């Protein structure tokens, strides 16, 4: 469920509406949340997902994930987990935009910023 969305003041505007429910089967946000979910949830979702258990292990190893045209054609995204005080992943923070602007490997530009933002959010929880 999307809880916050920010749009640029001008130009392309294509955000996920607050309150929108997105499938857990595609996209960087889904991969982050599923990578840290319980094994039962993973087993229920993975058969219909566009990614694999190995992909989720890569997310846990790296600590963030990127995708290009996975959930929506022409859109690239990067996501990182947000943890509560006990270390449990409770949310994902993401940035997305047109592949033409973000490229097919948007993590090179955005991963460090997202990890910093996730850390700041975690401190406020």
Where do the language-model regions lie?
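Conserved protein kinase catalytic core
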Residues: 1, 11, 104
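Extended hydrophobic
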Residues: 48-118
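Short, solvent-exposed recognition segments
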Residues: 4-73
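Short, surface-exposed, charge-dense and proline/glycine-enriched linear segments
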Residues: 18-29, 77, 95-105, 125
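Intrinsically disordered, low-complexity terminal regulatory regions
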Residues: 1-8, 109-125
